[in-house]
């Protein structure tokens, strides 16, 4: 399946149905009075997170979503049917932005979470609603209120427990393929990975999700190479696994290059727990391995793991280290609750916050 992490979508909720102007007509009843029913509500536009999706590719082929209008009211005090809702199915981790691409509407981080993006218009009142003691036969009714329409941006930030970062050809995809069932493209040239890949790793009967993103190079925060556009996919991770290839001539400089790009990107990426590993060590002899390990330790300020996806050396140890950090981070954070939104119990204000209540029919 092709990967797409950003999409522009046009949405429109349904208009409310018009109220009816009708009078009771029955034999032997001379003044039956008004019996026009109210119009039905227009349909809403919702967004909902579902399991099994990790791309927004479906929104490349369909960008317009419109709910149906409410049915007009009818005689005999019959209220029109409400319009049908439309629901956008998105992956967990999707953020919804206004057309300016900066104003956040909602951040959907839990499976099954729903949010109303556009409320349908209320139905108009029928003439029976306007009957008074001084006006027994009103001959007017309200039209339905129009629905809402807007253009929004969907932006996906994948949900993973650990993120793999490093220079191109640092062995990130090989690591992912060796510890999970993911099958990313692997080749001996830079930027083989063009989009993020996810895999589920298992260690000591515990599972966690790994995210592999395209490699970073110097100047990535300024758009050099693929740039830093995929770093958003590791913003939600608990821990970063920073891989430095043993084939680099200067492993300390390679580490600092990626670290600088993470700092330039911001969003607290450098505040996340970091595990550093010297990868592809099968290409070194013991003397060279000792030298480069010492150089990398000096650059990162900690003892790096020594791993090889080819021979399996050090793989179990680094997976256990990742697991321990993830367990610790999860224990410190309270579990998220799926917000329960009742029908029409939220109005989106200018600040994007929900307020109880519903629009009253004029």
Curated annotation (Swiss-Prot):
Coiled-coil features, chain-numbered ranges: none
Obg domain boundaries: 1-159
Subunit-structure text: Monomer.
PROSITE patterns assigned to the protein according to its UniProt record, in alphabetical order: G_OBG, GTP1_OBG, OBG
Domain called OBG-type G: residue spans: 160-327
Residue numbers spanned by region Disordered: 332-362
Family affiliation: Belongs to the TRAFAC class OBG-HflX-like GTPase superfamily. OBG GTPase family.
EC number: 3.6.5.-
Binding site for GTP: 166-173, 191-195, 212-215, 279-282, 308-310
Keyword hit for Zinc-finger: no
UniProt enzyme class: hydrolase
Subcellular location: Cytoplasm
Binding residue positions for Mg(2+): 173, 193
GO BP terms: ribosome biogenesis
Stated role: An essential GTPase which binds GTP, GDP and possibly (p)ppGpp with moderate affinity, with high nucleotide exchange rates and a fairly low GTP hydrolysis rate. Plays a role in control of the cell cycle, stress response, ribosome biogenesis and in those bacteria that undergo differentiation, in morphogenesis control.
GO cellular-component term (any): cytoplasm
Record protein name field: GTPase Obg
Keywords from the UniProt entry: Cytoplasm, GTP-binding, Hydrolase, Magnesium, Metal-binding, Nucleotide-binding
Cofactor(s) in the UniProt record: Mg(2+)
């Amino acid at each position: 399946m092709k990967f797409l992490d950003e999409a522009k979508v046009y949405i429109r909720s349904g208009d409310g149905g018009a109220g009816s102007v009708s009078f009771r007509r029955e034999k032997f009843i001379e003044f039956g009075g008004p019996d026009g029913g109210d119009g039905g509500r227009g349909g809403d536009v919702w967004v909902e997170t579902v399991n099994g999706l990790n791309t927004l590719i479906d929104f490349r082929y369909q960008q317009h979503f419109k709910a149906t209008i409410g049915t007009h009211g009818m005689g005999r005090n019959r209220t029109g049917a409400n319009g049908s809702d439309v629901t956008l199915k998105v992956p967990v981790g999707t953020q919804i932005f206004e057309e300016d691409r900066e104003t956040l509407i909602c951040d959907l981080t839990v499976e099954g979470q729903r949010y109303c993006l556009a409320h349908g218009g209320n139905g108009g009142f029928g003439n029976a609603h306007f009957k008074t003691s001084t006006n027994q036969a009103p001959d007017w009714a309200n039209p339905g209120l129009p629905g809402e329409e807007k253009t929004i941006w969907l932006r996906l930030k994948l949900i993973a427990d650990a993120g793999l970062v490093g220079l191109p050809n640092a062995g990130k995809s090989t690591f992912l393929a060796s510890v999970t069932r993911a099958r990313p493209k692997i080749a001996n040239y830079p930027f083989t990975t063009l989009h993020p890949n996810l895999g589920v790793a298992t260690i000591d009967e515990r599972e966690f999700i790994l995210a592999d993103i395209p490699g970073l190079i110097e100047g990535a925060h300024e758009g050099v190479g693929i740039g830093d556009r995929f770093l958003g996919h590791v913003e939600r991770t608990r821990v970063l696994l920073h891989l430095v290839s043993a084939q680099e001539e200067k492993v300390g400089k390679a580490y600092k290059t990626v670290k600088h790009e993470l700092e330039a990107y911001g969003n607290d990426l450098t505040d996340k727990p970091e595990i550093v590993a010297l990868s592809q060590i099968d290409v070194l002899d013991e003397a060279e391995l000792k030298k480069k390990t010492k150089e990398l330790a000096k650059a990162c300020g900690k003892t790096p793991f020594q791993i090889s996806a080819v021979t399996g050396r050090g793989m179990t140890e680094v997976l256990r280290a990742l697991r321990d950090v993830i367990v610790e981070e999860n224990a410190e954070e309270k579990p998220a609750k799926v917000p329960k939104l009742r029908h029409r119990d939220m109005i989106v204000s200018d600040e994007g916050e929900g307020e109880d209540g519903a629009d009253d029919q004029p």
